[in-house]
Amino acid sequence: MKRFKNILMASALLCGAFFTACDNNDDKPVFPENQDQAYDMSGFAKGADVSWLTEMEKEGYKFYDAEGNGHECMSLLRDLGMNAIRLRVWVNPDQGWSEEEGFFNPEGWCDKDDVVTKAWRAHNLGYRIMIDFHYSDIWADPGRQEKPAAWADLSFDELKQAVADH
């Protein structure tokens, strides 16, 4: 009996789907009257993550336009239409890295001072600035959420204050 009900229910669903698909509807799609309407896209962010820029510059990287002319990276990106910059900040990036893991950051790239330097450069060029807070000393993602070494033994209230201060 239960099997019969299941077969009957499946048949009813298939018939319902079949009959709705067989509609003889000749309606044409309706389009807005003014297809040439321009939309204001100025509120959208068109940007890049330049978190490693200061390190790349120190290592001697150069940035060029399509004609081969050298430019400062953030100016070049602005000239290409970017209006926002994303910057990653770690708590103490020189503490969370090791050569054994393949990560080594003795100069503390992406710490508060480094990020503030890049943020001021971006601000002076008219960029919108997006700060990506990593509440860790190194990469934080869903698979790896390590507290900064300096915060490891803090109570919950102390941890909340450390996050707010950061």
Placement of each model-derived feature along the sequence:
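Bacterial N-terminal signal peptides
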Residues: 10-17
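Bacterial Sec-dependent N-terminal signal peptides
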Residues: 17-37
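Substrate-binding cleft and catalytic face of glycoside hydrolase catalytic domains
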Residues: 76-166
